[in-house]
Amino acid sequence: MSWRKCAYNLRLRRAPLLFEIVAMSKTNPNVDDDAVIAATRRWVEQAVIGLNLCPFAKAVHVKEQVRYVVSPATTPEALLEQLMDELQLLSDTDADKVDTTLLIHPFVLTDFLDYNEFLDVADAAIEDMSLEGELQVASFHPDYQFADTDVNDIENFTNRSPYPVLQLLREDSIERAVEAFPDAEAIFEKNIATMEKLGHDGWDALHVGPA
């Protein structure tokens, strides 16, 4: 079972997950990594957890088991290389230390359609690394758009992050979280209702944009 129970991307295949902070990267000297991570963490706290868009997120958040990494990549090729490094690191690291990784990439795949196409590359990397069934990638983007929606439809904001993000997830953590939630099938529909009630003005009031 996938994290579709929380939300879907344009191709209806992925969704949000478990969060918290344990580390950050060294990256472009012209970019304030702390500010990028702070903006991303605020989005997690105010939107993902605050609006209960993913009921599984809060428990992991308080355990501080998320690795935040700001990528300096400016090309898809460079991002892929770093993604593979982070996939291997997550696979090699005890889940008690790092349960999930948020790979934030402000300088590449800023166009959502390009980003969405890259998700197939990410899936292929997992397969090539023999990590299928162990890890998967969830997707968030400032211009996230579900299939069959208009750009400004409020439901798209369930997966809109301050910066493009690839979230690296452990399959076994996903399975345990879904098994523990009594009505996982209803999460996506509930999220749409939450966003419709909140509206665009309510979303803007959360101040979860980029730094």
Region spans (language model):
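Expand to "…catalyze enediolate/carbanion chemistry for C-C bond making/breaking, isomerization
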Residues: 25-211
